[in-house]
Amino acid sequence: MHAMESRVLLRTFCVILGLEAVWGLGVDPSLQIDVLSELELGESTAGVRQVPGLHNGTKAFLFQDSPRSIKAPIATAERFFQKLRNKHEFTILVTLKQIHLNSGVILSIHHLDHRYLELESSGHRNEIRLHYRSGTHRPHTEVFPYILADAKWHKLSLAFSASHLILHIDCNKIYERVVEMPSTDLPLGTTFWLGQRNNAHGYFKGIMQDVQLLVMPQGFIAQCPDLNRTCPTCNDFHGLVQKIMELQDILSKTSAKLSRAEQRMNRLDQCYCERTCTMKGTTYREFESWTDGCKNCTCLNGTIQCETLVCPAPDCPAKSAPAYVDGKCCKECKSTCQFQGRSYFEGERSTVFSASGMCVLYECKDQTMKLVENAGCPALDCPESHQIALSHSCCKVCKGYDFCSEKHTCMENSVCRNLNDRAVCSCRDGFRALREDNAYCEDIDECAEGRHYCRENTMCVNTPGSFLCICQTGYIRIDDYSCTEHDECLTNQHNCDENALCFNTVGGHNCVCKPGYTGNGTTCKAFCKDGCRNGGACIAANVCACPQGFTGPSCETDIDECSEGFVQCDSRANCINLPGWYHCECRDGYHDNGMFAPGGESCEDIDECGTGRHSCANDTICFNLDGGYDCRCPHGKNCTGDCVHDGKVKHNGQIWVLENDRCSVCSCQTGFVMCRRMVCDCENPTVDLSCCPECDPRLSSQCLHQNGETVYNSGDTWVQDCRQCRCLQGEVDCWPLACPEVECEFSVLPENECCPRCVTDPCQADTIRNDITKTCLDEMNVVRFTGSSWIKHGTECTLCQCKNGHVCCSVDPQCLQEL
């Protein structure tokens, strides 16, 4: 798409938005969730009480330091979520006054352990945290350094627009970021908490007023009407790009279908295909009917369908009678002759013997018996006693004469049999006669008529002229008519898992998982009663296979590669242990040259003098050293040894407390500023417990681990789910684990690890920031936007994606199995 076309389309889009999103002084109630009103907080609500707020227009509530459970009822929470579910533009608004050093949750929307949306303010680390889940179901945390817990009133708004995030404090834009798009596909059972994460953790202490969720673009306008609005919003732009991508995909698919249709039409133009049927060497066209013996047959959709012919009773005139005609199933009228008191059909012969014993032969012709001239008889090679006289011929035949070799009328499923003086038709075994002369026969369905010999545990299946006795499932054959129960367990012909027990049953078998395994028997997985943590896999009963970097029965213990000597970092780097792995971090005075060597070999000296990152006073000269610097007096001069810190001169020997950190003490020593944490003397009764929480002996200052079992003392720290946690006077504060920066275009977060790593292949990366200005050409030379996906032309299971100008394709194994 050309740039001019894009700008015109965006302007048009903004005009449309302007027509439908004009706001006045109020907010559409259908787009607003007034949390405090909906929760109906009052005097009977434990842990909160109504107090004066920033203004008198709405109620304000003090969240006290006492047990409480401010959780929305199920019906109320579902009303919230119905407005919020699957929306990509919404804003959190709150007016609050948080006490000093409190770390608490403002609001939390979570399902089990999955935090879909949680806003937290930490007074310990002076930062605001947003925890959320993205559309890929991965947890994310955004940290905004800001002092909110200062016992002062603040207006906070956090606006989401697709992947665009804006934080306003007191109507000032503090942060604006591009993040992974949050998921609002909230499952049933999701809970809504205010002022706490759950009953035991994340207590907010202070006052809250005007807590609202606005499901509309740029909801911060409701709190600060004078702020500027933008058009289109990020979500609008994402929607526009998505529509373009959808239209592009439809166009591509339609073009491909049209191309295939044209190819098929070209082939069809060259031939005409008609479905036909073939029977006994004769081909019949679609819907054509014909008679085959005693059946009426039709060709339907290339298949022959036949029905037994129903013969009508013929109404014959005088001197005729119904009789079978060669090649036809039903009787037809045929001329007759009357001779010596008996009726004969046309062509039928009869012998008469005279008084002298002479044989005279007559034949019915034209309704009259006429004399047939005797042409003589062939000589017989059998004795007189084996010669047989015939009723329709004056010539005798030898005993055993083959009358069937002469012309006979036996047709389908009928066989010719010789008698002493003639041939007759007889139905084959398993067939019955369709007429009295047995010339035509049909199959007997022994199964339907109960004329079979199949015994118990079998199923009767009809076949032409016979039947079969098929064994039921779970049984094996004894003979043609009998089956007995089959022990699949004994013969190892079962489908039980290797970790299951097989129990034989009548007609089948049951599979039961062995102790220590769970499942349906056909699939059994090992069960570990304490679970396998940190990505470990349960491979046998109560046996965990731990990923690299963890150990212990439940993989609960992180291996400290640094202290145990598994790693040797470069002399210019320090080994930093991380959950599951480690990092070689450049020491003070060094920085990475951009190569990010895993062992720290890429650490280079920082020229503090050249970059101005030194504390030498004006009367000294800075000399760069490997890993540091030195403040030296010019030759022949005396120096004061003063230092420069935060733009202020500190005298040599001076000691001071940092303005923004009362727990750190700095001193100036001959031009160098040395800072350290305050030394904690727990024997001193006046020790500052805020700086020395480890000196707080009170039981009320202890914390309970997230697992509900481990107890920590004030000041203790631990790592939980890629977060660094600290117990401070009874409160648990957790923040994202500090990860080394990855200055690379493509990175991947390995499974069960906390920090991303660089990769060179964009197709392996999972943290690419989609740049919609970069496009790809697919195999059909169709332009694809970054973020779009399609099925590769000519395949059914190859999915391709455009990742920042790179085409990445992979085969879906599940799709292959379904083919």
UniProtKB/Swiss-Prot annotation:
Residues 1-24 form the signal peptide. InterPro entries: ConA-like_dom_sf, EGF-like_Ca-bd_dom, EGF-like_dom, EGF-type_Asp/Asn_hydroxyl_site, EGF_Ca-bd_CS, EGF_dom, Growth_fac_rcpt_cys_sf, Laminin_G. Ca(2+) binds at residues 443-444, 446, 462-463, 466, 558-559, 561, 577-578, 581, 605-606, 608, 624-625, 628. GO terms for cellular component: cytoplasm; dendrite; extracellular region; extracellular space; perikaryon. Glycans are attached at residues 56, 228, 296, 301, 520, 551, 618, 638. GO terms for biological process: commissural neuron axon guidance; development of secondary female sexual characteristics; fertilization; neurogenesis; neuron cellular homeostasis; positive regulation of hormone secretion; regulation of growth. GO terms for molecular function: calcium ion binding; heparin binding; identical protein binding; protein kinase C binding. Residues 275-334, 641-696, 701-759 form the VWFC domain. Disulfide bonds join 404-416, 410-425, 427-441, 447-460, 454-469, 471-483, 489-502, 496-511, 513-524, 528-538, 532-544, 546-555, 562-575, 569-584, 586-603, 609-622, 616-631, 633-639. Homotrimer. Binds to PRKCB. Interacts with NICOL1; this interaction triggers epididymal differentiation. This is Protein kinase C-binding protein NELL2.
